[in-house]
């Protein structure tokens, strides 16, 4: 094989590896952002219900605690972006 053909094949393989790594990172970040949005919506619902009724909703609080146990210790301190 000619050196140019070998170089082209190596370049394609390296490009493929880089693309896989980049898309994996993008997928992980999208999952983090979606989870954070879900946590933010739950916190907003808890605040609204607390203002309306004077106490927090048990169901929303339990759901929020499940999300926090899945990976976020402090959902209001996430610096993903």
UniProtKB/Swiss-Prot annotation:
Ion channel activity is inhibited by hexamethylene amiloride in vitro. Phosphorylated by host CK2. This phosphorylation is necessary for interaction with human BTRC and degradation of CD4. It is a single-pass type I membrane protein. Residues 53-62 have a biased composition (Acidic residues). One of its GO terms (cellular component) is membrane. Residues 50-81 are annotated as: Disordered. Residues 29-81 are cytoplasmic. HIV-1 lineages are divided in three main groups, M (for Major), O (for Outlier), and N (for New, or Non-M, Non-O). The vast majority of strains found worldwide belong to the group M. Group O seems to be endemic to and largely confined to Cameroon and neighboring countries in West Central Africa, where these viruses represent a small minority of HIV-1 strains. The group N is represented by a limited number of isolates from Cameroonian persons. The group M is further subdivided in 9 clades or subtypes (A to D, F to H, J and K). Belongs to the HIV-1 VPU protein family. This is Protein Vpu. It comes from Human immunodeficiency virus type 1 group M subtype A (isolate MAL) (HIV-1).
